[in-house]
Amino acid sequence: MSGLRPGTQVDPEIELFVKAGSDGESIGNCPFCQRLFMILWLKGVKFNVTTVDMTRKPEELKDLAPGTNPPFLVYNKELKTDFIKIEEFLEQTLAPPRYPHLSPKYKESFDVGCNLFAKFSAYIKNTQKEANKNFEKSLLKEFKRLDDYLNTPLLDEIDPDSAEEPPVSRRLFLDGDQLTLADCSLLPKLNIIKVAAKKYRDFDIPAEFSGVWRYLHNAYAREEFTHTCPEDKEIENTYANVAKQKS
């Protein structure tokens, strides 16, 4: 009979269910699904991912989570369906010393991009040509707020003994040089904005927003982000009907 050595921990059984793409198998466009996918990857825990075809939910899923849309999680055979509560549960349960904490150190790292997606949604849904400039201006204002935050050094980066002006921040991500829950929340939305706004409004994030572009370049260099992103065409398909022609 084989037994565990004293102090040996058993890996939890984790299965994440995410929205499937248009082919019914690949990863679909769902920023909340990607958010949890990134968190699990960054935690370094073993887990399985199942894509759910929303056009024909398999019978076993109807039994497992009736009336529930992805993302949802099965953790040691226990179903969890609220993605905010799932995030909190994973952060508390998959904790040091075995797993890293992902909570940001600075509250503003979470808050700074909170209005960006709402401004994008209003912009992409607008069909009135004369109103377009105002919606675009509101979106750019949020990008400017994000850019200012990313270019402003965090307290960790400032030398209190130096008389010189603090330099422009060179940190990789929102809260420092490590990806945190704040990035898992914002990056999937930024990717959607970049793809959909370009496709349907010919909008590019202005090059002058150097902090935003530095952030995106660093993020796209990380597999935890790029390998959890849907294909661009999935994002474009999602917004094909939403982004109606301006009249």
Swiss-Prot record:
Region (C-terminal), start-end ranges: 107-247
Reactions listed under catalytic activity: chloride(in) = chloride(out); tert-butyl hydroperoxide + 2 glutathione = tert-butanol + glutathione disulfide + H2O; cumene hydroperoxide + 2 glutathione = 2-phenylpropan-2-ol + glutathione disulfide + H2O
Protein location: Cytoplasm; Membrane
GO biological processes: chloride transport; regulation of cardiac muscle contraction by regulation of the release of sequestered calcium ion; regulation of release of sequestered calcium ion into cytosol by sarcoplasmic reticulum; signal transduction
Molecular functions per Gene Ontology: chloride channel activity; glutathione peroxidase activity
Region (Joint loop): 95-106
GO cellular component, one term: chloride channel complex
UniProt-annotated binding residues for glutathione: 25, 227
SUPFAM superfamilies: GST C-terminal domain-like (SSF47616), Thioredoxin-like (SSF52833)
Region (N-terminal): 1-94
Tissues in which the UniProt entry reports expression: Expressed in adult and fetal brain, heart, skeletal muscle, liver, lung, and spleen. Detected in adult stomach and testis. Expressed in fetal thymus and kidney.
Domain GST C-terminal: 76-239
UniProt record similarity statement: Belongs to the chloride channel CLIC family.
Domain notes from UniProt: Members of this family may change from a globular, soluble state to a state where the N-terminal domain is inserted into the membrane and functions as a chloride channel. The redox status of the active cysteine in Cys-X-X-Cys motif likely determines the capacity to adopt a soluble or membrane-inserted state. A conformation change of the N-terminal domain is thought to expose hydrophobic surfaces that trigger membrane insertion. The active G-site has a dithiol Cys-X-X-Cys motif which mediates glutathione-dependent redox catalysis.
Subunit description: Monomer. Interacts with TRAPPC2 and RYR2.
Entry protein name: Chloride intracellular channel protein 2
Native species: Homo sapiens (Human)
